Amino acid sequence: MEEQKQTPSTPTPDTAAEAAVNAATAAPETAGADDVAAQLAALEAKAREHYDMYVRAVAEGENIRRRAQEDVSKAHKFAIENFADNLLPVMDSLQAALADGSGDIAKLREGVELTARQLSAAFERGKIVELNPVGEKFDPHRHQAISMVPSEQESNTVVTVLQRGYTIADRVLRPALVTVSAPK
């Protein structure tokens, strides 16, 4: 006996394009198959289009995330730039004072006062506020007590400030070093 190759009665297309070609060349009795093949090809094209849109959306999301991280990194890196720019005139004044060899104490004092005003203005622009709590109640969040001294003031009141403190945007940058009145 001779083996006969059996061929399937309907072709099995490898791709949607082959299916469309096969459907177009099929006999009229397979007109329903033509419609199905055309629908299949259209749906496969639509699926490829949606997959492409999905891949692009994922890539765009990654790009947005990366750009946001870069923006945050730059913000951290250059956050002090504006404040440093405000300090440059103070440095210029100090360098001018050091370069002055006249020895005139009154002129030097005037220059130091001007420089202190420049520094205060730079602090103000940077929202740095000086803490000078003489006469206030002791606040451990804003003051650091160095010692207790006998005083006529109420107990736990700041008597003297040894070193001024500073806040920046209502956050303590450095607490004020103070002496506090002792209980009577």
Swiss-Prot record:
GO molecular function annotation: adenyl-nucleotide exchange factor activity; protein homodimerization activity; protein-folding chaperone binding; unfolded protein binding
Please verify whether the record's keywords include Secreted.
no
What Gene3D superfamilies does UniProt report for this protein, alphabetically?
3.90.20.20, Head domain of nucleotide exchange factor GrpE (2.30.22.10)
Q: Which InterPro entries match?
A: GrpE, GrpE_coiled_coil, GrpE_head
Record flagged with keyword Cytoplasm? yes
Q: Where in the cell is it found?
A: Cytoplasm
The GO cellular component terms are:
cytosol
- Which CDD domains did the record assign? GrpE
Q: Which Pfam families match?
A: GrpE
Bias-annotated ranges (Low complexity): 12-32
Functional description taken from the UniProt entry: Participates actively in the response to hyperosmotic and heat shock by preventing the aggregation of stress-denatured proteins, in association with DnaK and GrpE. It is the nucleotide exchange factor for DnaK and may function as a thermosensor. Unfolded proteins bind initially to DnaJ; upon interaction with the DnaJ-bound protein, DnaK hydrolyzes its bound ATP, resulting in the formation of a stable complex. GrpE releases ADP from DnaK; ATP binding to DnaK triggers the release of the substrate protein, thus completing the reaction cycle.
Quaternary organization:
Homodimer.
**Assigned protein family:** Belongs to the GrpE family.
Q: What is this protein called?
A: Protein GrpE
Organism the protein comes from: Cupriavidus pinatubonensis (strain JMP 134 / LMG 1197) (Cupriavidus necator (strain JMP 134))
Q: Which gene encodes it?
A: grpE
